[in-house]
Amino acid sequence: MTDKFDANDETRTVYAVVYDNDQPVSTGQFLAETKIEARLTRIVTLADYCGCGYGAKVTEALETYTRREGFYQLTIHSELTAQTFYENLGYQTYGSKYLEDGEYCQSLVKTILKWEKNMDIAMLIAIVGGLLGCYLYLTKNNEPKD
């Protein structure tokens, strides 16, 4: 698995790794692209462990991290052989197929609800707005009549 590392690894990469005893058997990387969009890369499972659900666990762990950090969506540049795997996890294709590093690939995207992180603020705004509306209604309806 050491061949799955690149120049981004020391500065802005977050990893998820599944171990079997002390051996890493599945891994994936998270890269922030913008303040609201991130990309999952280099999701790989050793051949002897394929079909055990480890790739899905890595992807789900990185999605949880993405959601917790407040990103809105995730993209993946998937080899065509893995496209169905990501579609089964809720990713949708976009754009045309393309050749990358000698492999045909397809980009996929999944919306990750940023709303959850900001829900407390949104609820507070709604409550304050509602209270203000009630206050204005009550003060207007309780004004003395001429």
Curated annotation (Swiss-Prot):
Instruction: Show the InterPro entries listed in the entry.
Output: Acyl_CoA_acyltransferase, GNAT_dom
Locate the N-acetyltransferase domain: which residues?
1-120
> Which SUPFAM superfamilies does the UniProt record give?
Acyl-CoA N-acyltransferases (Nat) (SSF55729)
Q: Could you tell me which Pfam families the record lists for this protein?
A: Acetyltransf_10 (PF13673)
Q: What is its EC number?
A: 2.3.1.-
Broad class of enzyme this protein falls into: transferase
The molecular function terms of the Gene Ontology recorded here are:
acyltransferase activity, transferring groups other than amino-acyl groups
Key words of the record? Acyltransferase, Transferase
Q: What family does the database annotate?
A: Belongs to the acetyltransferase family.
Q: What is this protein called?
A: Uncharacterized acetyltransferase in arcA 3'region
User: Which species is listed as the source?
Assistant: Streptococcus pyogenes
Taxonomy of origin reads: Bacteria, Bacillati, Bacillota, Bacilli, Lactobacillales
